[in-house]
């Protein structure tokens, strides 16, 4: 029977050592400036450790059931149950601290940055119901932040639409102005062509008049000479 008790204590000490290791990993991750894929790999490693830790606690609970009723005092049995319960509470706290740290990027977008170690200190000492309540509060605050962000995005979208409509109007006005300029240019060219034709016709008319006057002058001169010859 002592062997069963000793095996339980060995298993408990292993679980306790693992919990301390996980705490160290979480603290190291909290104080590290690593982001991106490396941070995700660290988080995955911690999550695997927490899963193993939970399995060890299940094994401790099963071992307690096996030694129940054997030569071990009720007080010792209750003490060991409390020891397992404390480790399970610690497992929940570590899991929730890890979940809180995964919100870091989202928090930095929506509002004040909540560091993972701050989340760990806040959930320390809380029971499961308190931890769940704290998580719900954080999620509610994040949802409110998302609503505010959505409002800002919608406002920006409306401004962008108004600017786009104004640009379309200005484009149409410029197109209309180009059309009127083309029409005016075409009319100006027609007027210039008409003026050129009129100028050419006027020049032709002046030449004919000059020839007519020349002929009349020659005829008049011939008449004068004839009269002078006749009456001399």
Curated annotation (Swiss-Prot):
Vesicular face of the membrane: 230-232
Keywords, comma-separated and alphabetical: Coiled coil, Golgi apparatus, Membrane, Protein transport, Transmembrane, Transmembrane helix, Transport
Q: Which InterPro entries match?
A: Syntaxin, Syntaxin/epimorphin_CS, T_SNARE_dom
Q: What Gene3D superfamilies does UniProt report for this protein, alphabetically? A: 1.20.5.110
Q: Which SMART domains match?
A: t_SNARE (SM00397)
Topological category with respect to the lipid bilayer: Single-pass type IV membrane protein
Please list every transmembrane segment annotated in the UniProt record, as residue ranges. 209-229
Q: Which domain of life is it from?
A: Eukaryota
Q: Which GO terms describe its molecular function?
A: SNAP receptor activity
Q: Would the keyword rRNA-binding be found if you checked this record's keyword annotation? A: no
t-SNARE coiled-coil homology domain: from which residue to which, for each copy? 136-198
One GO BP annotation is: vesicle-mediated transport
The tissues in which it is expressed are: Expressed in root, leaf, stem, flower and silique.
Q: Where can this protein be found?
A: Golgi apparatus, trans-Golgi network membrane; Prevacuolar compartment membrane
What the entry lists under Pfam families is as follows: SNARE
GO CC aspect terms: endosome membrane; Golgi apparatus; nucleus; plant-type vacuole; vacuole
- Topological domain ranges for the Cytoplasmic compartment: 1-208
- Which family, according to the similarity comment? Belongs to the syntaxin family.
Other remarks?
A: SYP51 and SYP52 may have redundant functions. The exact location of the SYP51/SYP61 complex is unclear, but is probably on the trans-Golgi network because of the likelihood of containing chiefly VTI12.
Q: What does this protein do?
A: Vesicle trafficking protein that functions in the secretory pathway.
- Assembly information from the UniProt record: Interacts with VTI11 and either SYP21, or SYP22, or SYP61 in the prevacuolar compartment, or with VTI12 and SYP61 in the trans-Golgi network to form t-SNARE complexes.
Q: What is this protein called?
A: Syntaxin-51
Instruction: Please name the gene that encodes this protein.
Output: SYP51
